[in-house]
Amino acid sequence: GSGGGTQTIILGALDPRPIVSFPNGMVSSSMQGGCTCENASLLRIGTGNVELSALFAPKPLGMTAADDWTREMLVPGKGFPEIKKLYALLGKAENTICPDLTHFKHNYNYVSRAVMYSWFNRHMKLGHKEPIVEEDFKLLSAQEHAVWNERHPEPEGGEKLERKVTKWLAERDDALLNSLPPEQKKNVFRKAWETIIGRKYDESATFSYEKNQLINLKTDERILLKPINSANEPDSINLWLGFAEGNKNLTGLAQSEDGHYLARVFMEGKEGPARTVANKREFAGYTHGFNHSRFARQVHDLLSVLSYLSQIHGKELVLHSTGEMQAQVIVAAYLAGAPVKEIKAEKSDFT
C-alpha cells in the first residue's frame, strides 16, 4: 500500500535486523513521499530518501526506476550511481541494483515484482527455481481477510483511546526521565533540544563580519549584528535581542563602559503565521519534515552571534531580550552554555 516503500527505507536505516531490502518506487532525489504516513517533522532536513536508503549498505538493497519521480535515479548525481559508489567503496558493489523500467509509470506491477522476487530469492537463499512466475490464486473471502473476529475482538479506538494512549506515553516517559541520574538526565534534554533545533553550539565556528553583517561561513546564514557603542576593554558584553533601533531600553548605551550589541535574527518582527508548503492537507510534516521552523532558524542565528562575540571578546555574555524573543534566547543560551552569564528577558505572553 501507499507508503510501504518509504517505510521500508526508514526501517532499513534504523533497524539492524533486516538482511535484505527492496524499497521499490521511492528511492529518489525528487519527490520523497506524498502521504502523511511517509512524513514527519525533522525527518528529512538536510537529507533525503537516497541518503537514508544508503544507510542500509553494505546489505543487499534493490530498487527500480520507473516513469515517475524515480526516472532520473540512473543519472549521475541523482541517486543510484552514488549508492553504487558507496557499495563499491565497501567492497559490495554487487549488493545493489536499480533496473531501468522507465517505460512504465509509477507501479509495483509484474516487471517490478519479478526483480524483487529474484532479489529476495538470491539473498534470502529461498531456493526457488528462476524465473519465478506468478500463478493465479484464489482470493480470500472477506471473512478470511478480517483481522478481528470472535477469537480476536476489535479493541477500542477513536479520540478517547488516543488521549489515553498519549497520557500513558507521557507518564511512561516522565517516569523514565525522573529515574535517570542528574547528569544523564541533563544530557538527554540537551540532545533532545539539539535535535529539535537541528544545531549544536559551535565555539570554533568561522565567520566574516563587515558593515554590521555577520556571516556564518559554514551555513551562509547572515545576521544583522550592530555595535551600539565602542567601549575600550569592556568589563562585560551585552547582546540586545528583539529590540528595534531607537527603543527606550537602548537609550544611553552609547556612553556605557560595557560593550553592547544589537542583533536581528531570521524573520524577526514578521507578523502572521510562518510559511508552509502548499498542500490542501494541513500537516506539519509536509513543511517541517524538510525545513527548519522559524523558531529553530532564529536560534541558529543566536548561536552564531554568541559564538562570534565569545570568540572576539573572550568574555561572558549578558543577554537582554524582549518578550517575543524570550524563548529563543533561553534555548540558545541553554545550548551555548558557558559563554552566557545572565539572561534579562521581558515577560512574554506565556510567562
Residue ranges, per PLM feature:
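Carboxylate/His-rich catalytic cores and anion/metal-binding grooves
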Residues: G3-G4, T8, G12-A13, Q255-E268
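Primarily recognizes the serine-hydrolase "nucleophile elbow" in alpha/beta-hydrolase
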Residues: G1-N49, S307-T351
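Catalytic-domain carbohydrate-binding cleft regions of carbohydrate-active enzymes
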Residues: T8-I19, P23-M26, S30-E38, L42, ...
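Alpha/beta-hydrolase-fold serine-hydrolase catalytic core, especially in secreted/extracellular enzymes
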Residues: A57, T64-N238, E245-Y261, E268-E316, ...
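Short, flexible loop segments at the rims of nucleotide/cofactor-binding pockets, characterized by
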Residues: E38-L43, L241-A244, F295
